[in-house]
């Protein structure tokens, strides 16, 4: 079983949109949702699933809206939540921003989309590219005299339309890796993880087949193979266009791509990663009236690489004032609402070390920090580099017309949840 009805509520719990799919749950049941939500919130027991009698409310919040599905027992909760999040994604594709105003301005389109997204409580067409073929931004409906089925619905390749043409055929490939890191005050790595994605921007005519080859160091956990000195990717997820049977046989990533932007695959890598941008801080207090913080930052990556847009957030006492800064490179500013100094460095070459000194007054002479200081946060982006060593070895583009196409590859390593604890 799946959803009986779907509601979109404003921030006060008033229904803006409702769609009854099965008729087995009274639509008035939604009146119990907001009181239940507020009660659980006051009790500190808020949960994504609320119940009133035999009726269950599965809900998510997006911006100033609540999306709620009602259902009776034995429903597939994970399916319902996936549908709600996919609904948000589709609405954002149509309206850019999903909020109360965009719902009120597009009632007709919203109802049309809800009719196509779900049928008798079960998700149906949730691909926004297919939906946009016959539900337009103007809300034009299909001609009633003719039965016109969008070609992608009957096509074996539902994610790509036929007849696409470009004057210049190109494919842009982005390999992006985010580094999640937690380092203790002694410099030991407590947690480290690489989260990677391979994104494509496709401008190709016709119905091309693409074959993507990664370097030999890369190993996929789901193949069950193992070698030394390999990069073992975990939680590998592919776009629906990838031929999984071909991948299982020879690890070739073969697919007919959607048009435009899409995420081909994502992966995770649990491995010991040293800080690519490291920072150490020393704090000194003088007679409880002033404090001096010295921060040393070091680029621990190849000298030929450069980290761009580096931001180092250094925590300072909550009662600090009268800031003065001295930096060997970049600029520093005090952000009192966050109790941090942000040291910004536009370009940070590998192997370099830089210093920043900050001086503050301390008007509250009685305070002595009891709790530990918050960690230093670091943001950065290193182009032409991946921490895992993953590389695109080749991209073959095969199309029956035989045209030539150019593949472009870009590598980016960036900070994710990147924290360095201080003593």
From Swiss-Prot:
One example of a Gene Ontology biological process annotation: intracellular protein transport
Q: Where in the cell is it found?
A: Golgi apparatus; Cytoplasmic vesicle, Clathrin-coated vesicle membrane
Signal peptide range: none
What residue ranges are annotated as transmembrane? none
Quick check: keyword Kinase in the entry?
A: no
Gene Ontology CC terms: clathrin adaptor complex; clathrin-coated vesicle; clathrin-coated vesicle membrane; Golgi apparatus
Pfam families, from UniProt? Adap_comp_sub, Clat_adaptor_s
What function is annotated for this protein? Subunit of clathrin-associated adaptor protein complex 1 that plays a role in protein sorting in the trans-Golgi network (TGN) and endosomes. The AP complexes mediate the recruitment of clathrin to membranes and the recognition of sorting signals within the cytosolic tails of transmembrane cargo molecules.
Regarding protein family, the annotation reads:
Belongs to the adaptor complexes medium subunit family.
Subunit text: Adaptor protein complex 1 (AP-1) is a heterotetramer composed of two large adaptins (gamma-type subunit AP1G1 and beta-type subunit AP1B1), a medium adaptin (mu-type subunit AP1M1 or AP1M2) and a small adaptin (sigma-type subunit AP1S1 or AP1S2 or AP1S3). Interacts with P2X4.
Name of the protein in its database record:
AP-1 complex subunit mu-2
User: From which source organism is this entry?
Assistant: Rattus norvegicus
């Amino acid at each position: 079983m799946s959803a009986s009805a779907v509601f979109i509520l404003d921030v006060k719990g008033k229904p803006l949109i409702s769609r009854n799919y099965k008729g087995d749950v009274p639509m008035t049941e939604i009146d119990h949702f907001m009181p239940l939500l507020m009660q659980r919130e006051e009790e500190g027991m808020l949960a994504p699933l609320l119940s009133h009698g035999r009726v269950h409310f599965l809900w998510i919040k997006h911006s100033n809206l609540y999306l709620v599905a009602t259902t009776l027992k034995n429903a597939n909760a994970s399916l319902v939540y996936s549908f709600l999040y996919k609904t948000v994604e589709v609405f954002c594709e149509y309206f850019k921003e999903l909020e109360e105003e965009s719902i009120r301005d597009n009632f007709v389109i919203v109802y049309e989309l809800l009719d196509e997204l779900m049928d008798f409580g079960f998700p149906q067409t949730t691909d926004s590219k297919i939906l946009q073929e016959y539900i337009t931004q103007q809300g034009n409906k299909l001609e009633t005299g003719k039965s016109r089925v969008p070609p992608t619905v009957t096509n074996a390749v539902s994610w790509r339309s036929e007849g696409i043409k470009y004057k210049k055929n190109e494919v842009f490939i982005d390999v992006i890796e985010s580094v999640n890191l937690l380092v203790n005050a002694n410099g030991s790595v407590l947690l480290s993880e690489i989260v990677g994605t391979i994104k494509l921007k496709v401008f190709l005519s016709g119905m091309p087949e693409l074959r993507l080859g990664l370097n030999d160091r890369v190993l996929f956990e789901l193949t069950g193979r193992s070698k030394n000195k390999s990069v073992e990717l975990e939680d590998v997820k592919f776009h629906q266009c990838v031929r999984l049977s071909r991948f299982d046989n020879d690890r070739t990533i073969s697919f007919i791509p959607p048009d435009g932007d899409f995420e081909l695959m994502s992966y995770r890598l649990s491995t010991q990663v040293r800080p690519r941008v490291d920072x150490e801080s020393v704090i000194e207090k003088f007679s409880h009236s002033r404090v001096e913080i010295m921060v040393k930052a070091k680029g621990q990556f190849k000298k030929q690489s450069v980290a761009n847009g580096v931001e180092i957030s250094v925590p300072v006492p909550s009662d600090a004032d009268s800031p003065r800064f001295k930096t060997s490179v970049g600029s520093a500013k005090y952000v009192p609402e966050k109790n941090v100094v942000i040291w910004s460095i536009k370009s940070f070459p590998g192997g370099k070390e830089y210093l920043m000194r900050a001086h503050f007054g301390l008007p509250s002479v009685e305070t002595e920090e009891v709790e530990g200081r918050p960690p230093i946060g670091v943001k950065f982006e290193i182009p032409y580099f991946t921490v895992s060593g993953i590389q695109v070895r080749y991209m073959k583009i095969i199309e029956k017309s035989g045209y030539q196409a150019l593949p472009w590859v870009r590598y980016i390593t960036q900070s994710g949840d990147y924290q360095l604890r201080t003593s």
